[in-house]
């Protein structure tokens, strides 16, 4: 192996390139990997992300839900492996309405998402029940699917910051956010530990 050759050359050290290097070097044992980028890693579009994730996608078809379920599985594996260095959580996505007619739409949307593979629907119409609020941090032992809440007291108890006339909520659960920069640097460090190299430069041609 010389500085001018490599088994694999990856053009770009954004999150996609770094993830590819990680999976080749760490998971597949391909250690002669070079990343080439004229900028610092994770500095072009990778630092513009909202850093949110979700398995909550409409149809037609279940392709996006299936892709995201698999992607979230991989992210959760990395969070466990790293001690959750990139602060992955599962706070969920929350949709709220003051229009009583939309409550039934929330239930229909939740049922459609469940049919696509997003997880089961739980409807909460009374102050009691088994609604499980999301913690501020972490992702373990959290429900998948969605919760539809139509009881005013339950809404006020768990979401006191919402407007007083809120009549229904849809809480999509396998959603949240994490630090994309911390994830990227963790993957890069692990890949480098296995022999991957990062070169500053521009790829101008492929023979």
Segments and roles (model prediction):
Residues 25-47:
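Glycine-rich FAD pyrophosphate-binding loop
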Residues 45-51, 160-162:
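Short, flexible, mixed-charge acidic loops at enzyme active sites
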Residues 163, 169-207:
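Helical element adjacent to the flavin cofactor pocket in flavoenzyme catalytic cores
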Residues 51-154, 158:
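Dinucleotide-binding Rossmann-like beta1-alpha1 core, especially the glycine-rich loop
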Residues 21, 25-26, 190:
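Gly/Ala-rich phosphate-binding loop of Rossmann-like dinucleotide-binding domains
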Residues 2-16, 34:
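Beta1/beta-strand and adjacent pyrophosphate-binding region of the FAD-binding site
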Residues 16, 41, 204:
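Conserved Rossmann-like nucleotide-cofactor binding loop
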